[in-house]
Amino acid sequence: LAAIISIPISVLLGIMIGKLLNRAKGREMITSYMIAFAMDGVYQFFVLFMMGPVIPIIHNTLKLPRGYGIRNTVSLLNMRQSLDNLLAVSVGGVKTPVLTLIIIAAACLFILWFRRTKLGQDMRAVGQDMEVARDAGINVERTRVISMVISTVFAGFGMIIYLQNVGNFPTYTAHTQIGMFSIAALLVGGASVEKASIKNVFLGVILFHTMFIVAPRTGTVITGDSMIGEYFRVFVSYAVITIALVMYEAKKRKAKSAAGLQLAADQLAEEEAKAK
């Protein structure tokens, strides 16, 4: 039910964000940040003030003591690992969530198939150079909106799978945490701002999840406090994203400078040829 409800919401948000980004070409990165902050404020307004007075809440245990708004953490123990347990196989005492793995594999196959379709090729062309794509007859604005819709729908499904696996819902931080960790995992796996692959996803998840396990234990061994490892993990998450953005901007400026020098050299060679 949650997945079904998430689809129209994700589609509407994807269309809205895509249209906003179409009006901010060349400034997509900072615009995306501002949209994220704005939508976070809208979301918190709904869960803090609309839940109860406007949107009815049946279970009083979900409400804040004041009578409206949602508590900081909502327990999902009744549905914890409900998807994982639907088709689980125990191998050597280790439970393997087969259905969840099938869904992940299906998503990967969909992406591989989609990249070979005309729309997938159009998206790739738009991502590489919008002006060249427009000259080739591609509707750049429409393609960007569709790509954003697909992204938000996948993100909604991913959030639902994540929450049912964890078994609790941090009302005011869950959406920011999973987004930050997903970006960091992708970058750790070798992805860049311009390009990412399925290989980067799996490698990043393995490395990042390993850090989740190792960091608290390392903090306990070195300082006697596991929270030091937790702080280190958060630091690495933000540091990886920051370094990736700095490297991307430096690479972009270097390429622009090289193109300018090449253009100047070509013009000089042309003038010398005319002089002869």
Question: For each predicted feature, which ranges?
Answer:
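Hydrophobic core segments of alpha-helical transmembrane domains in multi-pass membrane transport
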Residues: 37-44, 100-112, 151-159, 182-190, ...
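Cytosolic-side transmembrane-helix boundaries in multi-pass membrane proteins
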Residues: 128-142, 213-276
